[in-house]
């Protein structure tokens, strides 16, 4: 049984990125698709799609296409899970984290859905800090 599917997703992306893989396959969930949407919008991944699992009626996989520079430079330098099942981390609108002085993003789960730290600051809402990406 997996206790932290978000950490599993981030680890798979980090490992595939370190090994210069073009794609990474992850079991699908709505929150993972939302995280992939944020990563695509912020320019960390090239794209993602949802594929059905062959032989299963309802199971789906999230296929993330990683992004590299012209000389195979990684677009993701690092990923860190912040709030874990054993230790939740929350931030108020006044105390939102800044990743690398604003060069990275913090993914935050709010009442308005998953947002980046900049979107939270603009809307003046806080929430659970899921991960840092830089």
Swiss-Prot record:
State a single Gene Ontology molecular function. Answer: structural constituent of ribosome
Its GO CC terms are: ribonucleoprotein complex; ribosome
Concerning Pfam families, the annotation shows: Ribosomal_S8
Report the superkingdom from the record. Answer: Bacteria
What keywords appear on the UniProt entry? Ribonucleoprotein, Ribosomal protein, RNA-binding, rRNA-binding
Q: Which Gene3D superfamilies match?
A: 3.30.1370.30, 3.30.1490.10
- GO BP annotations listed: translation
Q: What does this protein do?
A: One of the primary rRNA binding proteins, it binds directly to 16S rRNA central domain where it helps coordinate assembly of the platform of the 30S subunit.
Oligomer status and interactors: Part of the 30S ribosomal subunit. Contacts proteins S5 and S12.
Q: Which family does it belong to?
A: Belongs to the universal ribosomal protein uS8 family.
Q: This protein is called what? A: Small ribosomal subunit protein uS8
Organism encoding this protein: Acidothermus cellulolyticus (strain ATCC 43068 / DSM 8971 / 11B)
